[in-house]
Each structure stands twice: as C-alpha cells, then as structure tokens.
C-alpha cells in the first residue's frame, strides 16, 4: 500500500514541448524534494526515450537530473511507460532508482483502490492500427536493431514522427478513455479510482457508483497535476507565476455517502469544459 499524498502527472513530452513547460516540470520536481508521499509519472514524460550503450537523448538531462535529486531526497518515484517512452532501461531503474513499469499500476493507496495506466491502445477500433504495430515496436529484436542506429539519427527520426501520435491520442477529446474508465469502475470489485493520461484532456469525472475517473491532461501544453489524498483528488494547474491553482476537486465516496454519488453524474462535460478554456488544447 502506498501512503498519500500522491502526485500524478503525464504527457510532458519533453523534447517536443515548449521550454516553458519543461522548465516548469524541473521546478516542480525540485519543489517536491523532502515532501511526504510519492510521485507517479504516468507515461510520455519524454517525447522519446532510448538507451544506447553509451548514449541517451541529451534533451532529457535536466528532467532526469531533477528526478535523481528527488529520489535522493527520499521520495518514491514510479514511471509508467507511455507510447513515447516505452523503452525504459538501466538509467531509469538503476542509476536514478525509479520504479519503471511497462504494465498498469494497481494497488491500494490510502482508502482508494486505484488503477493507473497511460491509456494507449485502450479505445478498441480507434486504436486498431496502433495495436497492430505496438508489439513490433516493443519486441526485443526491434530494440536490438534500433541500438545499431546512430543516436543522433535515431533521436531525430523518433522526434520527427511523434507528432502524429500526439494528434491521434486527442482526436476524440478524451471521451474514449473516459468511457473505458467508467466501465472499469462499474465492474464488480472494480477500482474506486482510474487514472489515465494519453488523451491530453484534463478532468475529473464521478461515476454513478461513486468512483472517480481522473486525467491530469498534457503537461507539455499546460502544467497540470493530480494530488491524491485520503479523502479526495484535486486537479491543479501551475500558473505562470508558479502558483498552484485548483481547477477541480472530487471527494472520495464512502459507504455512508454513496447514496448521494449521483450529484455529479452527467458532468462529463468537465473534461470538455477544461478543454474549452484552453487547458486541454
């Protein structure tokens, strides 16, 4: 069991995102040093990641340095692979001491039963093409072959082809992943909280049975993060002045309060509302 608070963010796309959002990420990581709780990086933190024998992408160094400092301060860090940073290796695990996962994170966090997953490949027919190519991209033979490519050329090639993936992931304004999350929450014994990234659309959605779907949105567009405590989950945006501005908050429903869980049902538009104000674009 992980003890809250948990800080969750995703889709920073360092290497392709504006310098302002990458700098904000570095400052945020340094700000967490010495804090209690844990950090969850829910995929696509880097727009591309690969570990050659003696080389790694240079654009990642400021963020990796800040993560190393955060781990040295004692805060646990878990990195869940996305579709852009699925080739994690020894630098992340051994050098930095990060728990790097290529599978979803499922565990109890305080009073929450949580599932955290990046979200790529979950939308059925909408992701059919990606699902066909994903096993090839992640196959050990493909990884071995890519190590034969010069790091400069390999990095340039990967960054040059990544934009199409980012556009595709947000094509349905996050509704596909929202529906997947609500279906999981509705299952018998399902989680009380599902967190996805990938869509770049931020929002908190209450399920009819009281559970919650949360998405921090794309940090690479506007710095946002989720903060999970024992009683609630908050969605924050970091303003240009460096202050945390709460965009939304949902309390954890207990057995006593579940009869009132429908008070927020139907406010699916919160995802779209966040997008309409510019946070999810």
Language model features: what each stretch is:
Residues 2-9, 14-109:
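Core catalytic region of metal-dependent phosphoesterases/phosphodiesterases
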Residues 107-110, 206-281:
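Binuclear metal-dependent phosphoesterase catalytic core
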Residues 15, 86, 123, 222, ...:
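Flexible, glycine-rich phosphate/dinucleotide-binding loops
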Residues 119-178:
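Active-site-proximal loop/helix segment associated with metal-binding centers of metalloenzymes
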Residues 31-33, 70, 144-149, 165, ...:
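Short acidic/polar alpha-helix capping motifs at helix-coil junctions
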Residues 37-42, 69-73, 109-112, 144-151, ...:
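Short C-terminal domain-edge/linker segments immediately following a structured domain
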Residues 95-103, 113-115, 120, 124-132, ...:
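Conserved beta-sheet core of the metallophosphoesterase superfamily
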Residues 163-165, 173, 180, 186, ...:
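C-terminal functional module detector
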């Amino acid at each position: 069991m992980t003890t809250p608070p948990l800080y969750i963010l995703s889709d920073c796309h360092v290497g392709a995102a504006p310098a302002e959002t990458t700098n904000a990420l570095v400052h945020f990581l340094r700000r967490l040093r010495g804090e209690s709780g844990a950090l969850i990086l829910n995929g696509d933190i880097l727009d591309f990641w690969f570990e050659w024998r003696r080389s790694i992408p240079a654009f990642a160094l400021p963020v990796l340095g800040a993560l190393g400092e955060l781990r040295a301060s004692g805060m646990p860090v878990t990195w869940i692979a996305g579709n852009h940073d699925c080739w994690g290796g020894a630098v992340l695990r051994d050098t930095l001491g990060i728990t790097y996962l290529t599978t979803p994170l499922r565990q109890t966090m305080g009073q929450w039963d949580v599932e955290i997953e990046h979200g790529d490949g979950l939308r059925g027919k909408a992701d059919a093409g990606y699902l066909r190519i994903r096993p090839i991209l992640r196959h050990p033979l493909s990884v071995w072959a890519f190590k034969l490519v010069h790091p400069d050329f390999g990095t340039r090639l990967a960054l040059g082809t990544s934009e199409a993936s980012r556009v595709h992931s947000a094509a349905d304004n996050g509704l596909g992943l929202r529906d997947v999350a609500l279906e999981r929450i509705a299952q018998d014994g399902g989680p009380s909280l599902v967190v996805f990234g990938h869509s770049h659309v931020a929002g908190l959605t209450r399920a009819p049975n009281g559970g919650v779907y949360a998405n921090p949105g794309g940090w690479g567009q506007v710095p946002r993060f989720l903060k999970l405590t024992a009683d609630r989950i908050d969605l924050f945006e970091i303003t240009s002045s460096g202050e945390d501005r709460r965009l939304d908050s949902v309390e954890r429903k207990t057995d006593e309060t579940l009869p009132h869980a429908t008070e927020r049902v139907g406010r699916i538009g919160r995802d779209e509302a966040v997008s309409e104000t510019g946070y999810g674009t």
